[in-house]
């Protein structure tokens, strides 16, 4: 369980952000003079909703309904005194999707250290036997293939640094090529140095494009490709690529970013974003110890 001091810390960060976000959002809102609005605030604030969603993935729970009714409403009553019913809380989740996304992007993400890892992981929304009768994500989720076989759902594309901190993320349908997000400048914003990936990211055009933008894509060589010279440092970094697999594992097993009980797309996005936010608050993240020795030699890349 998360200690109350940590809950207070998360709430203070979320509340400060929500207040600033509301002020900035109000500047760009278009006023509707034809229709009168009550503008009555919700009983529970956006910051409290965000914190409750984040705590769900930090406590090892697997059923959100049980978590909210049996844990939040009973044991966290003193921290969240203005609680709403479970059905009302589910309705309010969609109202914090935009603040939650910007909160993660602008506050919680780590900084690039010059060594980054990229990978994608499938987010299955149903079993393969139920694909033809699945209706919740009809027109959104797609069939895809990963190292574990075929699946139906979405892909989560992650970039992390050597400290295990998430640098950026993107959700795509399951049939999108892993290399497509790397072709978007917004996904690679503030990413510099070496970017280690698996064989699914091999592509000469992609390598040249990234190299011109200050990013060196480091991948293994396929069996039917000509061998290429690679420095010892790059070979060692490729052996440490399991770091991002560990991050994916924590998102799925400690947090619960993947399950098949979603009833709407908004619920899926709220669950996924809160899982990523919860991981950013983990005190202990998987990391590798990287030390550079200055030998006085000049390296030309």
Where are these regions (language model features)?
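Short alpha-helical elements
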Residues: 1-301
């Amino acid at each position: 369980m998360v200690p109350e001091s940590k809950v207070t810390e998360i709430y203070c960060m979320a509340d400060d952000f929500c207040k600033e976000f509301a002020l900035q959002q109000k500047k760009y809102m278009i006023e509707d003079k034809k229709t009168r609005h009550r503008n009555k605030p919700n009983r529970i604030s956006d910051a409290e909703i965000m914190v409750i969603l984040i705590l769900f993935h930090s406590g090892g729970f697997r059923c959100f309904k049980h978590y909210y009714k049996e844990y939040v409403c009973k044991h966290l009553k003193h921290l969240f005194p203005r609680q709403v019913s479970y059905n009302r809380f589910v309705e309010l989740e969609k109202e914090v999707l935009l603040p939650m996304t910007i909160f993660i992007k602008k506050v919680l993400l780590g900084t690039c250290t010059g060594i980054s890892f990229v990978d994608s992981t499938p987010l299955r929304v149903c079993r393969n036997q139920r694909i033809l009768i699945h209706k919740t994500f009809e027109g959104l989720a797609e069939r895809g293939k990963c190292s574990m076989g075929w699946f139906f759902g979405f892909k989560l594309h992650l970039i992390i640094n050597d400290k295990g901190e998430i640098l950026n993320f993107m959700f795509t349908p399951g049939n999108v090529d892993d290399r497509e997000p790397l072709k978007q400048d917004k996904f690679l914003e503030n990413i510099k140095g070496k970017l280690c990936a698996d064989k699914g990211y091999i592509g000469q055009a992609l390598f040249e494009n990234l190299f011109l933008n200050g990013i060196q894509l480091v991948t293994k060589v396929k069996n039917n490709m000509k061998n290429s010279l690679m420095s010892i440092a790059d070979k060692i970094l490729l052996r440490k690529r399991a770091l991002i697999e560990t991050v994916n594992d924590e998102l799925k097993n400690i947090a619960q970013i993947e399950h098949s009980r979603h009833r709407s797309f908004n619920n899926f996005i709220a669950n996924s974003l809160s899982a990523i936010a919860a991981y950013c608050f983990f005190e202990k993240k998987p990391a590798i110890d990287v030390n550079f020795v200055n030998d006085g030699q000049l390296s030309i890349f």
